[in-house]
Amino acid sequence: MTTLTGAQARRIAVAAQGFAEPRPRGSVTRACLRRLISRIQVLQLDSVSVAVRAHYAPVFSRLGPYDRDVVDRAAWSHSARSPRLLVEYWAHEAALMAVDDWPLLRWRMREYTHGRWGTQIVRKNPRLADDVVAAVKELGPATAGQIEAHLGAEQRGRKGPWWDRSDTKWVTEALFAAGVLTTATRVGFARHYDLTENVLPAAVVAREVDDDEALRELTLRAATALGIGTEADIRDYFRLAPGQVKPALAKLEADGELERVEVDGWSAPAYLRAGQIIPRRDRGTALLCPFDPLIFFRPRVQRLFDFHYRIEIYVPAPKRQFGYYVWPFLLDGSLVGRVDLKAERTGDALHVVGAFAEPGQQSSRVAEALATELRTMASWLGLSMVTVGAKGDLAKELRAAVKRR
């Protein structure tokens, strides 16, 4: 069995995610987005918008500044000239994925016939599910709240938390998980549901994929997107179960699609595409949002980069080590620091609440490169300034580097 060094594994992983290639010289187009999605497979969705919403960030991190309408049009609009490219589903967590790949998750839709959560609510309300579908047929694309109002259902006094949702909203979400409904569009990030057959092409809706074939394809795509990964890494990409991935990996290895290797310092074997080229140089510089596919499986981040990373949104402010919404900084293929970022629209600034260098890193080198990326990000977000707070061992040097730009 081939043995790779940790550095080789890291270079493979970074390159597989598209960071080793130069950014487009011209505008980022729909074709650029299509190629990126074919490579990384998913753009995770998240409601936090303290800097920029999560599904926009991985595109910026790999392709540079771009018009976010490119993603919006690909995901939430359709025309004969510009067909819908992306669709929402539980691919990793809630995520955008290629429309053509939606049938690969039919097995999951069957598992979620009564929803992903709150299944007892759906089971005891079969008529309500029929009523929701009828309401959507009558209303067209509608939010869960609009569906609820149309049905004359009792609405809760507060908005937001899952545990405060009405039965109608639970059932609507369950119908999404079951593939009966999907997202037609989003307005202010609110999901507008419609019947899946009204949103996706008839050929996609009609396509049936054998469960084993779908699982092999998802496993292969996960392994390819990761570049190199253990069974646990590969499982996490599409949130598959051990019993699904083990036979898929065995079949892919037997068919010569994947090669099993060892990596120095890793306790489990890893898999990579057969014939995978190992990059010789460390490349890739970018700010990474917490839900970037390169880093969304934290055990792999620790193994690849020796970088301990946890999101601290739900940690009480006084107990946070680094901050509320912290972006790791990738420099020449290594994670060398992190910044807690906030877009302050009223102040026209991308504000660095805290800045931290990793142990052993040359702070001046990190600060100079980071300042450049922050300036680029601020411009992309339509903000004229980068400001740096006092928190963190890198803050002083980063502030000086920003001022020099």
Predicted regions mapped to residue ranges:
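Long, charged, low-complexity, helical-prone intrinsically disordered regions
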Residues: 1-405
